[in-house]
Amino acid sequence: MSKPAGSTSRILDIPCKVCGDRSSGKHYGVYACDGCSGFFKRSIRRNRTYVCKSGNQGGCPVDKTHRNQCRACRLKKCLEVNMNKDAVQHERGPRTSTIRKQVALYFRGHKEESSGAPHFPATALPAPAFFTAVSQLEPHGLELAAVAGTPERQALVGLAQPTPKYPHEVNGTPMYLYEVATESVCESAARLLFMSIKWAKSVPAFSTLSLQDQLMLLEDAWRELFVLGIAQWAIPVDANTLLAVSGMNGDNTDSQKLNKIISEIQALQEVVARFRQLRLDATEFACLKCIVTFKAVPTHSGSELRSFRNAAAIAALQDEAQLTLNSYIHTRYPTQPCRFGKLLLLLPALRSISPSTIEEVFFKKTIGNVPITRLLSDMYKSSDI
């Protein structure tokens, strides 16, 4: 659905008629957030019938905090505020991934129009000076907003456009800012990958290195950045969902390969759960991203061992990132003296899932057999990112 005329800031000031969160425009006849409009669309398109958890149809609270707790009451509220069932396009199945088109554009150099270009809200957080630019690019939510008529590449350039802060935490616990359907997991994963590139370019210290060193660091760290992103933005990692997304099953996949992938998905679940248990804030995530990125160790490219041009500078940047994180935790969490050590001890677990498994599960449907490293290099060199 297209947004009404006017600035994004004005649209975001209009509350969702269903849950009271910030709306992203008119959906099915009423102002609604992307979470509620998506829920309504899926419910109507799939002809869902829900049962109230409390047995009191319509009695459950439907607000930003509780909107995901009772689907029956949420759907009832959607209908009460006059969301139009007839406006849901039943004849149209799940849309073809716009991310696939976006990736293709970077290889073809073309621009195309899309009615489903992604939008990433962002906001600035107080942070140490070393990470000022980084924190400004850290989004508080991964929304699936539709911006009609916007060129897809232009949408990618605008990933970090500042918007009002989203009230997304209760006692430091991240809230789910949108419901992720199975068909959207690949798109969310691709967005995390794009954001890693945008993030790397936003770090002033990173851009001072030679292009060769920048690309080598990014190619080596993308897996850890991706897993950190999953932990930060609550992308679902249950095995059934991910296997459904990838299309792999016992009928079409070698049993040894399938068992390996399931084992690594379980490892991914464990590491993500450990990060979420510690309830990291945006600055801590930014520091950890720098720590895993600035690794001055030789990397392999096939059978070739490549060395960095300025390994000393890279090592110094990692030291600075660790010192910054330690200082920040000491100030922000004075009652948790072991927090810094706990976070560092979690970092090796980020590599418990192989790059090939991430590509197979999250990206193969989106970009086919294009290697992620090739995509990273191509997009990082693009002036549009």
Curated annotation (Swiss-Prot):
Residues 16-83 bind DNA. It comes from the Eukaryota. One of its GO terms (cellular component) is nucleus. InterPro entries: NHR-like_dom_sf (IPR035500), Nucl_hrmn_rcpt_lig-bd (IPR000536), Nuclear_hormone_rcpt_NR2 (IPR050274), Nuclear_hrmn_rcpt (IPR001723), Znf_hrmn_rcpt (IPR001628), Znf_NHR/GATA (IPR013088). It is found in: Nucleus. One of its GO terms (molecular function) is RNA polymerase II cis-regulatory region sequence-specific DNA binding. One of its GO terms (biological process) is negative regulation of transcription by RNA polymerase II. Belongs to the nuclear hormone receptor family. NR2 subfamily. Residues 155-383 form the NR LBD domain. Expressed exclusively in the neuroepithelium of the embryonic brain. Gene3D superfamilies: Erythroid Transcription Factor GATA-1, subunit A, Retinoid X Receptor. PROSITE patterns: NR_LBD, NUCLEAR_REC_DBD_1, NUCLEAR_REC_DBD_2. The gene is NR2E1. Orphan receptor that binds DNA as a monomer to hormone response elements (HRE) containing an extended core motif half-site sequence 5'-AAGGTCA-3' in which the 5' flanking nucleotides participate in determining receptor specificity. May be required to pattern anterior brain differentiation. Involved in the regulation of retinal development. This is Nuclear receptor subfamily 2 group E member 1. Keywords: Activator, Developmental protein, DNA-binding, Metal-binding, Nucleus, Receptor, Repressor, Transcription, Transcription regulation, Zinc, Zinc-finger. PANTHER family: NUCLEAR HORMONE RECEPTOR (PTHR24083). A zinc finger (NR C4-type) spans 16-36, 52-78. It holds the Pfam family zf-C4. Monomer. The keyword Coiled coil does not apply.
